[in-house]
Amino acid sequence: MAFKLWLLDEETIYEHVFERYTQLEGQSGKLAQDLGIQDRRGGVLEITFEPSGLEGGRKKKRVRRRNKASSVEEDQNVAVDSYHVSVGQSISSLHSSRDNGNSTTGYVLWSTTPFFINWLLYSTSAAPFRLGSQVEVTCGSSCEGHKLELPRLVDLTGADRGKRGILELGAGISGILPVILGNFVDTYVSTDQKGILNKLKDNIMENLSQLTRKRCISRSLRLELPTVEPVGDADITAASLPSKSTLHLEVAALDWEKINLQDKKTHSLHPELSLIGETCSSVYVIAMDVIYNEYLIDPFLKTLKQLKHWLQTTYNLQFHVLVGIHLRSQEVTTLFLEKAIIEYDFTVYDIVDQVIQESRFNFYLIT
């Protein structure tokens, strides 16, 4: 069964937060009681993402070969590809008072991101983000029967002609979202503070082989489509050959404290953001575990407000935001929702799904 959306307002915020943290307390014996670092023991992490039960995945592949007519439906239903990434992280930088202006949480991989990837690609309940479909919305009797139309976040088949993009905020150093989700979108822009970017680029390049469904071009990573030797008198390039579709993948600095998209120099200051507007018809902003203290809330929401206004008014893009929160401080979660809904006037939905509710995480859809 697909997830449902609970439309939150200034009254239901508190009911939602109370219920979610009560659920969390009831599962305290099953869930890890830590801050959420994926693995603090090593400098290099090896992580595998795969469908639950590889035998099931192999069975699906055999069916697709025998019956091509059913392949689209099966591919859309759940991802069948597996991925293995190697992530270099820096525990010493995490505890440093000198690195990146003392903003160091991005130097390690936090567990919200791997959980989100597994849920998005392999959970049957996440199908609306893979299919692009209507999702049931609940918010009391006044919303009974209401549905929200969601564009695809990822296209597992490559058959959809719509152009989709992802803008990642607060990416950190891991680079695993772009090399995995980049297989299913047309443009991916990964952003963080300037001091994080070199390690982020290193990890993306290390795992570029996981982009199995795309050819990747990138100005920031200096990746170009290879040329092919001429055959006879023909001047043939890789771009002219029938092959994989192309992913535009960029890494860029984006400081939430300094961004000003009303500046007329936006195109020169943020060419990667312009790339999304110029190449896509819909964009999802993804932010995993970036709300962990109260000081980040206003800069983050101000950035979202600017991005939404600029991308919608300048490029007429469909704009959605997915925020993943590791449930630590109940006060921080409450303050984030209060400010998003009341002060910044965003429409915020809680993604209601059993798999998520059995974890330490929560995901919010913002429009």
UniProtKB/Swiss-Prot annotation:
Function, as annotated: S-adenosyl-L-methionine-dependent protein-lysine N-methyltransferase that monomethylates 60S ribosomal protein L1 (RPL1A and RPL1B) at 'Lys-46'.
An MF annotation (GO) of this entry: S-adenosylmethionine-dependent methyltransferase activity
Residues covered by region (Disordered): 55-74
Enzyme class name: transferase
Sections of the chain in a coiled coil: none
Organism per entry: Saccharomyces cerevisiae (strain RM11-1a) (Baker's yeast)
EC number(s) given by UniProt: 2.1.1.-
Gene3D superfamilies, sorted: Vaccinia Virus protein VP39 (3.40.50.150)
Family in the record: Belongs to the class I-like SAM-binding methyltransferase superfamily. RKM5 family.
Biological process, per Gene Ontology: methylation
Binding-site positions, S-adenosyl-L-methionine: 110, 170-172, 192, 256, 288
UniProt keyword annotations, A-Z: Methyltransferase, S-adenosyl-L-methionine, Transferase
Domain of life: Eukaryota
Biased composition (Basic residues): 58-68
Any one GO CC term of the record: cytosol
Protein name in UniProt: Ribosomal lysine N-methyltransferase 5
